[in-house]
Amino acid sequence: MIKLLNQLTHVRLAAPDVEASVRFYEEQIGMRVTDRTDDAVYLRNWGDYYRYSLVITHGDEPALEVMAWRAQSAEALEEAAHRVEATGIAGSWRESSLGHGRSYTFTGPFGHTMELFWEVERFHGEGEDASSYPDRPSRRSRDGVAPRSLDHVTIAASDVRAFAAWYSETLGFRIMAHTTLEHGGISVFTVLTTNEKSHDLGVVLDGSSRAGRANHFAYWVDAREDLLRAADILMENGTPMEYGPSIHGIGEQNFLYFRDPSTFRVEVNTGGYRNYVPDWEAYEWHRAQGSNNFYRNGQMPMSMTESFPPADGPSATEEGILPGTENELINPFAKHGQG
């Protein structure tokens, strides 16, 4: 397995009301604005090692515009670009951007835009931002949920297996697990990673006709108690829980989901395990094994099938592909005990 990418560094979101979203991420999430330009606001968590991990720009509808990844080295960046171009996809180079150096941007076969770079500005808090612990980029946030860092992003694609295969074969993502329907062999969810985490890229099945959609992105907190506290803080400030708190079977991470003011879905998670097996082969999970709900005693809300930007069909569907499974594919985890 070729090792080209190191980690997810930031996501760029479009929001109809930029300032409402910025206030939410500052006050309820506990992020800090680092920069403002004419067309974007940049924010970071206290434990993010780089200048920012969230960029918010104006858009008519909520959307994931870009997901950015740091390469393993300067040579790996060149190799990644070469391998993308070899598949017939034409990307573009940019000499520098705010907070990082030369980057390669491309739109993948399912419509999702990625930016790859190597050179990056490390964040070192000064004054009241400085931590008393030398390894921390800044002191722990006193505000809101206060996640340590950005964790992962989950997109929606019309063919989960094909998406995973392309990113694995082209860019070296490790495929960690699949959720497959018990009959028909249709994959409704797959997780991939660039490192030892259970995943930093997830894929749900998309039955809409709109390419490049995303389901959510996630923040990391240190402990389960922090996650439960996050639910308390959010609900006390008028942000309801969409799903959770609970635990996913795949990855064994504690989770909760909610929406930001643009309606884009956000997850907070913690726990789970690291996988260091270099020749790992992904297992096929079935829903009854608790792939989505570790406890096998709940059901996923139908709203969780919505991806962004909105389209003519929910994200966990491929209606009509196999007669008799339409409802399963619209929400694979709707049955009690599977969600």
List where the protein language model places each region:
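Vicinal oxygen chelate
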Residues: 1, 7-16, 59-146, 190-191, 238-339, ...
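Catalytic cores of nucleotide-enabled group-transfer and carboxylate-activating enzymes in metabolic
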Residues: 2, 6-27, 33-36, 40-41, ...
